[in-house]
């Protein structure tokens, strides 16, 4: 049973519920610890936290940690994005690194934007190569512990295949980024967020990518990327089954100081 979730969002950014409601949902779902993550401020983007709301988020997470001590452990996380002007992060408990933008386009906004992104690069392979090169840049950020939704660019592929994910060129680009991130000690999340929001029936990353990660000796955690309290553990059974089918027998969980392996 999965007992921790380190990726969820609240009304401090683009979530539907308060931080306290997410903590209570996690407790009700049987989790022993919950990490609430904040989309880092990005100038001009209203789905992220603002520079003014960020300190209030940190204060609220401290309050919730104290209030629910002895019931559920509460961690304060940041989802960092490469588009942020920030080059360092305040003292969060942990940091997730993600890439939501490429070449001026939002990677995951909608299918029309995804298709326009591909067209702007002249085709899906060039777009994928650029995306994974961006992802690989996260390796240089020592504060980042977790790689968020590694193949987010495939969000709409179940509806209409946009990327040739089985091709050698696509996998070479993805594998190269994965290898750089793994070499830097990053943990990869299996992310079920697109399941709860109805875009996919399977988690990120693709099984072929997870099998490659396993061959490298890579580490994983399972997160819901929930934006609503009723999705706090959405898809966890599917994610665990996927991890096991790709050869993983343990998750890496945050203990307040560092990450440690926990067998399934």
Where are these regions (language model features)?
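Flexible, active-site-proximal loop/turn residues at the rims of small-molecule/cofactor binding pockets
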Residues: 40, 101, 153, 194, ...
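Hydrophobic residues within beta-strands of alpha/beta enzymes
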Residues: 34-36, 95, 147, 188, ...
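An N-terminally biased module of ancient metal coordination in phosphate/nucleic-acid-related enzymes
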Residues: 1-82, 87-89, 93, 154-156, ...
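Conserved residues at the C-terminal ends of beta-strands
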Residues: 37, 98, 150, 191, ...
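Non-catalytic positions within long, well-ordered alpha-helices that form the structural scaffold/packing
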Residues: 27, 139-140, 214, 244
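Extended substrate/RNA-proximal surfaces in nucleic-acid metabolism proteins
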Residues: 48-183
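Charged catalytic cores and adjacent phosphate/nucleic-acid-binding surfaces used
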Residues: 1-10, 19, 104, 160-264
């Amino acid at each position: 049973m999965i007992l921790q979730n380190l990726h969820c969002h609240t009304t401090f950014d683009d979530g539907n519920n308060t931080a306290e409601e997410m903590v209570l949902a996690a407790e009700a779902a049987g989790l022993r610890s919950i990490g609430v993550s904040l989309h880092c401020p990005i100038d001009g983007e209203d789905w992220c936290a603002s520079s003014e709301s960020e300190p209030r988020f940190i204060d609220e997470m401290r309050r919730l940690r104290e209030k629910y001590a002895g019931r559920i452990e509460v961690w304060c996380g940041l989802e960092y994005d490469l588009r942020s002007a920030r080059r360092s992060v305040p003292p969060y408990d942990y940091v997730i690194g993600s890439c939501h933008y490429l070449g001026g386009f939002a990677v995951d906004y909608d299918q029309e934007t995804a298709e326009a992104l591909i067209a702007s690069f002249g085709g899906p392979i060039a777009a994928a190569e650029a995306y994974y090169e961006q992802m690989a840049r996260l390796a240089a950020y020592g504060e980042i512990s977790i790689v968020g939704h590694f193949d987010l660019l495939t969000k709409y592929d179940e509806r209409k295949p946009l990327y040739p994910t089985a091709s050698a060129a696509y996998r070479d680009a993805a594998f190269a980024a994965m290898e750089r991130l793994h070499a830097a000690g990053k943990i990869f999340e299996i992310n079920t967020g697109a399941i709860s929001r109805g875009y996919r029936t399977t988690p990120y990353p693709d099984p072929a990518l997870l099998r490659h990660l396993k061959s490298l000796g890579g580490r994983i955690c399972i997160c819901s990327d929930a934006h609503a309290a009723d999705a706090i553990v959405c898809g966890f059974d599917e994610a665990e089954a996927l991890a096991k089918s790709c050869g993983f027998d343990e998750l890496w969980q945050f203990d307040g100081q560092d990450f440690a392996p926990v067998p399934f």
